[in-house]
């Protein structure tokens, strides 16, 4: 394929939670093709589950070589910064991940679950007391993960407002200018530096105190400390908030879906996995990888130095892996979705996110069994110009 017939990517502006129909014929006929993103050089796009999983898991595709390069293909005005765990390869990535992983073990997540339940109950008390109609984004979807990750990091409650708007800005594709994104990231770095100083003076059992101790033992650089803090703070709430809001929207858009879970609450863990598979949460092209040597993938030879974007959204709708992939089957049993990525960069907080989603959904079903949208589905406003899809507001009644 020549440069003149390289396709533009992403494939048009999304409508609510629709997945662009262009992925299906690509998976069938051209599983790897050349695309041009809004910024950077042309790259390869892979769309089949098998190939996406391979790219995510193969060490010959480097995140580190893609970081901080203006030439790296991307959908954001500002290139992903170096020094973040998201933009490292082993062994640097392994060293940093090991420092953080102990806070996200299955045991620690299980131990935190009662606290998650307390947070959810308190938020739903406020929603119920305020009365219908209510905005479920402002009332539950956003404050829940903000509270959870803040408590894990040791962020004081009164500081939540300081990072919320900045974190939304750094995830911008078209909603903010490059200058605004750079300023927002600088503000987050300044705040994380202040928080680190505070934890150095008053250490606790939180994750930021542990990171500060590692920094002071020369196991973490200044930049790694702040960038890791930003990754945890932003990644720890934005994706979970968006996923929960999108999940409730889909359940209420078709009331029989809500009724199924209300009458069969034991299905909630299975339903959460299916919603993770079905919802195309992230924007295509968020994280490109650079081939460090020639690699064959999707029937093409990716040359050393060329970039690859792996579409997990497309992979999660691959009919080679999933029966009726475009059907939201809340009782689906075989579900090897890639919503949390794969390989060494698989989402560190996957178990934490699952726990939050399960607790919040179960509590919502129990507290408000008659929950329904307060406006027609087509009137729900959607976030625009961001790496993540989600309702801006989710008006509900009961």
UniProtKB/Swiss-Prot annotation:
Keywords: Antibiotic biosynthesis, Heme, Iron, Metal-binding, Monooxygenase, Oxidoreductase. The keyword Oxidoreductase applies. Gene3D superfamilies: Cytochrome P450. PROSITE patterns: CYTOCHROME_P450. Pathway: Antibiotic biosynthesis. Its EC number is 1.14.15.43. PANTHER family: CYTOCHROME P450 YJIB-RELATED, P450, PUTATIVE (EUROFUNG)-RELATED. It catalyses: nocardicin C + 4 reduced [2Fe-2S]-[ferredoxin] + 2 O2 + 2 H(+) = nocardicin A + 4 oxidized [2Fe-2S]-[ferredoxin] + 3 H2O. GO terms for biological process: antibiotic biosynthetic process. Belongs to the cytochrome P450 family. Its cofactor is heme. It is an enzyme of class 1 (oxidoreductase). Involved in the biosynthesis of the beta-lactam antibiotic nocardicin A. Catalyzes the conversion of nocardicin C to nocardicin A. Cannot use nocardicin G. This is Nocardicin C N-oxygenase. Residues 63-90 are annotated as: Disordered. The lineage of its organism: Bacteria, Bacillati, Actinomycetota, Actinomycetes, Mycobacteriales. It comes from the Bacteria. Heme binds at residues 93, 97, 289, 345, 347. Disruption phenotype: Disruption of the gene abolishes nocardicin A production, and the mutant accumulates the biosynthetic intermediate nocardicin C. One of its GO terms (molecular function) is iron ion binding.
């Amino acid at each position: 394929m020549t440069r003149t017939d390289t396709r533009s990517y992403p494939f048009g502006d999304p409508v609510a939670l629709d997945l662009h129909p262009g992925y299906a014929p690509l998976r069938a006929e051209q599983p790897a093709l050349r695309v041009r993103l809004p910024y950077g050089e042309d790259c390869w796009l892979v769309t089949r589950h098998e190939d996406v999983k391979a790219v995510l898991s193969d060490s010959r595709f480097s995140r580190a070589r893609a970081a901080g390069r203006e030439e790296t293909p991307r959908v954001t005005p500002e290139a992903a910064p170096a020094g973040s765990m998201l933009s490292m390869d082993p062994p640097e990535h392994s060293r940093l991940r090991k420092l953080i992983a102990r806070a996200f073990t299955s045991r620690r997540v299980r131990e935190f679950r009662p606290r998650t339940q307390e947070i959810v109950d308190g938020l739903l008390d406020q929603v119920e007391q305020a009365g219908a109609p209510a905005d479920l984004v402002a009332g539950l979807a956003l404050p829940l993960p903000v509270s959870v990750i803040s408590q894990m990091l040791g962020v004081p409650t009164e500081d939540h407002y300081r990072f919320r708007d900045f974190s939304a800005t750094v995830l911008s594709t078209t909603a903010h200018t490059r200058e605004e994104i750079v300023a927002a990231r600088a503000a987050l770095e300044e705040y994380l530096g202040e928080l680190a100083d505070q934890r150095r003076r008053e250490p606790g059992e939180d994750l930021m105190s542990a990171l500060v101790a590692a920094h002071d033992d020369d196991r973490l650089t200044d930049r790694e400390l702040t960038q890791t803090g930003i990754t945890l703070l932003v990644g720890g709430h934005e994706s979970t908030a968006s996923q929960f809001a999108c999940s409730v929207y889909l359940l209420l858009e078709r009331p029989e879906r809500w009724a199924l879970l209300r009458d069969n609450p034991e299905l909630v863990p299975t339903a959460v996995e299916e919603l993770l598979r079905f919802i195309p949460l992230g924007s295509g092209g968020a994280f490109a990888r650079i081939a460090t040597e020639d690699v064959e993938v999707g029937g093409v030879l990716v040359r050393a130095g060329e970039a690859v974007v792996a579409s997990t959204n497309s992979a999660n709708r691959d009919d080679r892996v999933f029966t009726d992939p475009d059907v939201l089957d809340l009782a689906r049993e075989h579900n090897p979705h890639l919503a949390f990525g794969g390989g060494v960069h698989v989402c560190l907080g996957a178990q934490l996110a699952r726990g939050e989603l399960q607790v919040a959904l179960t509590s919502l079903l129990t507290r408000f069994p008659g929950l329904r949208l307060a406006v027609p589905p087509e009137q729900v406003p959607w976030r625009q110009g961001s790496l993540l899809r989600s309702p801006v507001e989710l008006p509900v009644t009961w």
